[in-house]
């Protein structure tokens, strides 16, 4: 049987040939200019930043970039232990940033319910994994979300899905906190929203100051959570309990 073009067998595994480092990459698709004044927190309204088709097209280029990184580190990408590493790393990075393929409208579809509940709703200790956009290393932690409904509630699991969409991107913790709060506010129009994130940043643990036990805490308070100290204190007390 004739092998597909662009595929070779190495150590019994079939893999695509990587472009050589330094080779000119294929022409990039032009992207429409972003609207002036658009803020990161407004991204929940936008369409997908990346499609599955783009993943497939860009995977060889991403793998070639990892191969070039290995060479630049003085390694041999062709040795047995690293032979498939560029492809594994490229696939992993696409997964770590899969939030670019999802939109809030996909998640919230049919999950907003009319409900005459006017007491605080809290989901806390939501595990979160993200990638620091400054060093491309992980930061991990937990997210606590509370909101005061205004005639509508959101399926509880959808709060965790919102966290997943925004955390699976290149991020800074401050922006991530705000994006989650703004998305919930825009979707539900509640009386208020509070979001607190506690995270450990590998860029502080593995490099730089190398502080193993440091945690970064960020918060965004909107509506009555910002305006009313008693509401804010109730939320902060409940997430600590």
UniProtKB/Swiss-Prot annotation:
- Superkingdom of the source species: Eukaryota
InterPro entries assigned: GTP-CH-I_C/QueF (IPR043133), GTP-CH-I_N (IPR043134), GTP_CycHdrlase_I (IPR001474), GTP_CycHdrlase_I_CS (IPR018234), GTP_CycHdrlase_I_dom (IPR020602)
Q: Which GO terms describe its biological process?
A: cellular response to lipopolysaccharide; dopamine biosynthetic process; neuromuscular process controlling posture; positive regulation of heart rate; regulation of blood pressure; regulation of lung blood pressure; regulation of removal of superoxide radicals; regulation of serotonin biosynthetic process
Q: What subcellular compartments does it reside in? A: Cytoplasm; Nucleus
The positions annotated for binding Zn(2+) are 132, 135, 203
What is this enzyme's class at the first EC digit?
A: hydrolase
Which residues make up the pro-peptide?
Answer: 1-11
Question: How is this protein's activity controlled?
Answer: GTP shows a positive allosteric effect, and tetrahydrobiopterin inhibits the enzyme activity. Zinc is required for catalytic activity. Inhibited by Mg(2+).
Family statement: Belongs to the GTP cyclohydrolase I family.
Q: What protein does this entry describe?
A: GTP cyclohydrolase 1
Q: Which organism is it from?
A: Mus musculus (Mouse)
Q: Which gene encodes it?
A: Gch1
């Amino acid at each position: 049987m004739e092998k597909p073009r662009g595929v070779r067998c190495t150590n019994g595994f079939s893999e695509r040939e990587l472009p050589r480092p330094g080779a000119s990459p294929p022409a990039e698709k032009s992207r429409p200019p972003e609207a002036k004044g658009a803020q990161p927190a407004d991204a929940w309204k936008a369409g997908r930043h990346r499609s599955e088709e783009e993943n497939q097209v860009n995977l060889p280029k991403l793998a070639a970039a990892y191969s070039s990184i290995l060479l630049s580190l003085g390694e041999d990408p062709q040795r047995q232990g690293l032979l498939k590493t560029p492809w594994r790393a490229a696939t992993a990075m696409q997964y770590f940033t899969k939030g670019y393929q999802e939109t809030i409208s996909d998640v919230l579809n049919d999950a907003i319910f009319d409900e005459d509940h006017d007491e605080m709703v809290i989901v806390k200790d939501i595990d979160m994994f993200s990638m620091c956009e400054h060093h491309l290393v992980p930061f991990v932690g937990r997210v606590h979300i509370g909101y005061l409904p205004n005639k509508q509630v959101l399926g509880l699991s959808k709060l965790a899905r919102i966290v997943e969409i925004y955390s699976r991107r290149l991020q800074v913790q401050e922006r991530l906190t705000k994006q989650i709060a703004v998305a919930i506010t825009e979707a539900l129009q509640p009386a208020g929203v509070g979001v607190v994130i506690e995270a450990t940043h590998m860029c502080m643990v593995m490099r730089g100051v190398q502080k193993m036990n440091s945690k970064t805490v960020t918060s965004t308070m909107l509506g009555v959570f910002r305006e009313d100290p008693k509401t804010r204190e109730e939320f902060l007390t409940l997430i600590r309990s």
